[in-house]
């Protein structure tokens, strides 16, 4: 891994035995092994996270490219339809509230005159209107208390 041969490793072990002594050498070797294991696990976790992010970025890039390609294909179809008005255009994906040209007007991209909208019925909270009696008192709004904050308009 680090390019250390067996003889170099044996030399490091001999120096550690002389410096630490025979009582503390097994504990030091165990601690060094634990630290090396933690470093390896941390390195592998970071490497996996980077690979996962690269994979996610690649997937995002691929989806974006596919979306752009589909938009380009749709634009080509629309351009081809403008060049050849006798062919009908079918969109790649359904679009809500899209205006479809009718068969008589496929040669032009202009909208005709707008038709007047149908009159809207009067809005009411009740389903049926009740006739107002002359004896029925007209409801009055409650008097505003001056100790309360003003009402919003």
Curated annotation (Swiss-Prot):
Domain of life, per lineage: Bacteria
Primary location group: membrane
Keyword hit for Protein transport: yes
GO biological process, one term: protein transport by the Tat complex
Disordered as annotated region, ranges: 78-153
Membrane topology: Single-pass membrane protein
Gene Ontology MF, one: protein transmembrane transporter activity
Signal peptide (residue range): none
UniProtKB keywords: Cell inner membrane, Cell membrane, Membrane, Protein transport, Translocation, Transmembrane, Transmembrane helix, Transport
Keyword Cell membrane among record annotations: yes
Subcellular localization(s) per the UniProt record: Cell inner membrane
Pfam families to which the protein is assigned, alphabetical: TatA_B_E
Listed transmembrane segments: 1-21
A GO cellular component entry from the record: TAT protein transport complex
Family: Belongs to the TatB family.
Role according to the record: Part of the twin-arginine translocation (Tat) system that transports large folded proteins containing a characteristic twin-arginine motif in their signal peptide across membranes. Together with TatC, TatB is part of a receptor directly interacting with Tat signal peptides. TatB may form an oligomeric binding site that transiently accommodates folded Tat precursor proteins before their translocation.
HAMAP family (alphabetical): TatB
Oligomeric and partner information: The Tat system comprises two distinct complexes: a TatABC complex, containing multiple copies of TatA, TatB and TatC subunits, and a separate TatA complex, containing only TatA subunits. Substrates initially bind to the TatABC complex, which probably triggers association of the separate TatA complex to form the active translocon.
PANTHER family: SEC-INDEPENDENT PROTEIN TRANSLOCASE PROTEIN TATA, CHLOROPLASTIC
Protein's name in the database: Sec-independent protein translocase protein TatB
Native organism: Pseudomonas savastanoi pv. phaseolicola (strain 1448A / Race 6) (Pseudomonas syringae pv. phaseolicola (strain 1448A / Race 6))
Gene transcribed to yield this protein: tatB
